[in-house]
Every structure is written in structure tokens, then in C-alpha cells.
């Protein structure tokens, strides 16, 4: 009944098993991937034909985590998995990026890849298994695909590269890098690092690519024994006559449009050129009694012609679209303290790309609690990236963040994390929001620069400045050009785009997307060296605006955090019965108070005086009464044989009638009344914490001469 095929291979410290032919047999391709106890099911369905009139490739990738994989039931009323988490969205993008360039040009059949996480070992992240599964499922499906693709995670621990480190190992690693590629080329890199050099980063990419050959070989074996017959597909023949006519009418117009340096003016000229070419082609067709050519087909030809023009100009050493050479960064302007009531803000403008970044400080209570499949954790640093349609002069949908926005936000966050102060040095939680107000390339890297400046403006003691830059690469044959600080148009027309962020000491985040298979290690080396040059220039501009070590003052509107350590046994005294004491404290002082199990008390208050008052009262509540010390006490209650006196909040003692005065006291009420302030000395305390107090001992110690005379 089943034609099950299984392949097992060693991959670093783990054993990987690929299975096909038993589960999801009606899909075009389905592979079950197991790495130790982490199991994912990857399925591919490809439609047999493209939709008529469709002019784009409809590929969708959905990575879905099931809570049963971790032996849990989902929360909420419906007890079902809800909308995709940030982790699911980011992993879907991670899978999509290396496989998309491997489908042939002109293949427009809809392809849907769905990966379900069926079982998870908390030590093994399912993302690498999911990438391997997607590649294997595409390969066994027999559809046109220039794979298979391998994937690897690389760590860097004690100066050594580690293949597919576990979660525990990653906690000690200076690098978390995911690389994907074919047998002959790297296609995608996504990484976070602790200020590592270009050489170490490139070494990790090469190491990962060498190791993933084991994955590619195993997929080849799986296809040989369990793959479906290859689908016979060939691209539609190119309409050479139409290509020639479009070039005849459009080339001069496009070259003229690309002489315009301003983005909006250039876009307008290109739209006008497109319209004119379509009108001229329609008129030409009408003159011979033929139908006008399809505008979508003409649009695709014009796009290819644009790419050819821009690429050839750059490779021949001519100025780029906006007049720069290949190494120049666009003009940068920086302004901090832009918004009056926010905790920190910065406006970072680079050419026609602009980010307004806002920093907000909070307490531990504001940390994001994430109920992840691999275990719950809290995150004290959040970065949210928003790009509204007006940033590109367009209209569009406004609402929940799209995959691109989530991906860009995570990249910017990765870049900044390494330079944040340690929690013990700065106990605030931090939220950064990057509002992209203009966009013409590299908005995620503008978010890194603006984010660093906004954090400094908010008073966050950053270890150093962090800057990011987006790079491009164009290659034809043996000729190639690396472009510094790419524009949006150059991003679309290039063969590789990569983003590098870091400090003066090293790289903190690297993201690469490569569309062709001829990018060598040497080319990447040149590109990374040029990126460092650009990054150092931007760091210099940031240094001029906000010199290193000059952290801004905390905003008047930001909470002040006061941290004190108390004896854990005294926590109950601060909280009180049913929380009565701490509730009264927070209401009366207007502060927010958090207490850890270890006795660390964090007081948050916008009003510094209120914070100090809360601190004083907590210290009173938790202070221990010292025998032999004199206290200012309050008479709480009169008794026949003395009085109950409170020496501290919650600390009462007995003032015996014999200890009130040196002479004989017949009636306590003759000397004391309730509410009266008295000076008392603590004579002793018993094992139950009960205090014995004396007024006459206090008088004798503080006024020895009158006391002696009285005697």
C-alpha cells in the first residue's frame, strides 16, 4: 500500500531522517524530516497550469507550529492555534528566500508549500528541519526547480565553528547564522552576531555551505528512490518581434528617465514612458489591422529592458541612477529629541530614505511574554517597524504588519541587541518603534541607525554606536560591481542584495539574498570589505551628531527605577495580608513596585520624590529592630501594666509601666496617651520577635546628667 522511502544521515552532532511515500500522498511532494525528536512534515502542491493572464509567480510558504508538538493545549476560549506568531512568519520567510530564485523564469504555476511542526525537542529548533523538508518536498515533486537546497545553522563558540548547535549551545555562542544554498552556490544568509569580524562571518558562511552538502546528497538519494517523474515543462517562446519593437520605441525614453535623480520625478517619467510605448505599439498594430499587444507582456519586456540599461551603465563605470559612484553613501542628516513627550526620539535621513524612531522605557512588567513552542520566555527589548504607503508616495492598506515589516523589524532588532547594556546595568524594558516616513532603499538599515540614536536620546547607555548599510551587486560574466547604499530600483535590478549592521568593532547582523549562482567567496569578500567602508562612514556621521559616551538624560516622562535588595524572608512584610500593604504603598506614593523571589525590589515612578518615599517606606517595613538602639515610637494602646509602642511599621513592643519613668508610676495614663510620640530604647527581643522597650533607658542614654541628678 505504501511505497515508503527512508534516508538517514549524520549532520553535525545530530542524525537526520528523511521519509516520503507514507504520509500526505496526494500532495505533489511530501517529506517527513526528523532531527532527534523534532519532526516536521513538509508538503508541496503545484498546479498543473498557470492561470490565464497571470504575469507573476504565485509561490506561498506557510510554516505552522502545532502546540501538540510540545505536548500542550492552546490557550484562549477556542483552544485552537490562532494567527501566525512572529516566529512562524520569520521562518516562512527564511524558507521562501532561498527557494524562490530557483524556479525557472516564466514558470507561473501556483506553488504552495506548507510545513507543519509535528513534534519538537526544545534543544533543536525546527527551522532547519523545515528548510530541509521544503527543499526535499520540492525535489521529490518533480516540478521545475533548480535544487535541491541545503540549510545549516552555524554557531561560533570559543573560536570554533559549530554545525547546528543546540539551544543550550547557542546561549554560549557569539554567532547564530543560518545559511542556505545549492551544491555550487550560497543563496541566503540570516545572522546575528556579537561584533564579529568580516573574516569570521564569511568563514561561517563558507563552513555552513561546505557542511550542507550532506543534506543535498541525501535529498538526491531520496529523489532517486522515491521521487515522482519530472514534470515536462518548457517556457513559452519569447516574442522576439515584440521585444524588438518595444526596445525600438522605449530605449531612448527609458535612458532619458534614468537621467533624473529625484525618485518621484523619475517614477513619473517612467510611467509616462510606459504609457507612450503602449500607445505607440497600439497605433502601430492598428495601422496594419492587428490587435494591440498585451500590456502585461509589454510591461515585463519594459522591466527587463530597464534592468539591462541600468546594469550595463553601472558595469561600464557610468554614474548610478542618482549620480553617485559605486562606493558613495547618500547624504545623511540626523536630529535627536524630535518629539517632546516621548522618552527618546531620532530622525535619521539618508538620501530619500527616512526613519523616525521612537524609544519608550518601561519596567519588567512591560516585558513581552512569549509563549513559544520551545518554551515560554520574556523579552525586554522590542523593535517594531512600520512602513505606511505614503513613504513611497502611494496609497494602500493600513493595518496589521505584513511579513516584510515583521522581517525588517527583526533584522533591525538583531543588529542592536549586541550593543544594549546588560540587564544588571540597565533594568528597563525598551520598545523601539521605527516609523518609515520616506523610503527609497535600505529602510531597515535606517531603522538600525535611527534606533541606536533614539536609544541614546532616551538615556540608554549603549555600548557603542550601531549602523547598518544595504549593499547590492551586479554581475555579468566575469565583470561585477558592488554598490554601496542601494536605492529601491537598484535592489530590484541587482543579482545580490545584502545588509550589514554593526559597530566599529564588528558585525552584529548580516542578511544576504542572492538571486544567481555565480557569486564566489572572493566576490563576497570584496562586497563585505566595501560594506565595512560604508558602515564606518555612517558611524562617523552618527558620532558627530551624538558623540560616544554622551548618553542623554532620562526624559522627565520616563519612569525612574530604584532597585533595592531586601531579605527574602521580609517579602511578606512588604506585600502584607492579601496584598494590603503593597497596594496601599503603590496607591499612596503613585509608584509601581515589583518584587522578585530573590528579594530584589524595583520601584518605578515618573516622580523621583515619590520613588524615594516608596523606597524609604519599604526600608522601614523590612528593617530589623536592633537591640540597644533608640527609636522614635508611637503609642498605639494603653494597658494597666504599660503601653504598646510601635517603633517601626509592623514592629510593636511592650513598654512596661516600670520602664516609663525613674519615679513610681501609678497610672500609665498620667504619663502617656494614645498617638503620643515617645523615645524608647529596645532592651531585648525574644525568639518570637517580641520587643521589650524602655523610656527611662532612652532618657538615661540621651541625657545622662539630668537622669543622674533625678536619681
Swiss-Prot record:
Coiled-coil portions: none
EC code(s) of this entry: 2.7.7.8
Residues the record lists as binding Mg(2+): 491, 497
Location within or outside the cell: Cytoplasm
Enzymatic class: transferase
Keyword Phosphoprotein: no
GO biological process terms on file: mRNA catabolic process; RNA processing
Ranges of residues in domain S1 motif: 628-696
KH domain location: 559-618
PROSITE patterns on file: KH_TYPE_1, S1
Primary site of residence: cytoplasm
Record field: transmembrane: none
Family matches, as InterPro entries: ExoRNase_PH_dom1 (IPR001247), ExoRNase_PH_dom2 (IPR015847), ExoRNase_PH_dom2_sf (IPR036345), KH_dom (IPR004087), KH_dom_type_1 (IPR004088), KH_dom_type_1_sf (IPR036612), NA-bd_OB-fold (IPR012340), PNPase (IPR012162)
Reactions it catalyzes: RNA(n+1) + phosphate = RNA(n) + a ribonucleoside 5'-diphosphate
Cofactor(s) this protein cannot do without: Mg(2+)
Molecular function via GO: 3'-5'-RNA exonuclease activity; magnesium ion binding; polyribonucleotide nucleotidyltransferase activity; RNA binding
Keywords, ordered alphabetically: Cytoplasm, Magnesium, Metal-binding, Nucleotidyltransferase, RNA-binding, Transferase
GO cellular component, as recorded: cytosol
Protein purpose: Involved in mRNA degradation. Catalyzes the phosphorolysis of single-stranded polyribonucleotides processively in the 3'- to 5'-direction.
Family: Belongs to the polyribonucleotide nucleotidyltransferase family.
The protein, known as: Polyribonucleotide nucleotidyltransferase
Organism: Janthinobacterium sp. (strain Marseille) (Minibacterium massiliensis)
Lineage, broadest ranks: Bacteria, Pseudomonadati, Pseudomonadota, Betaproteobacteria, Burkholderiales
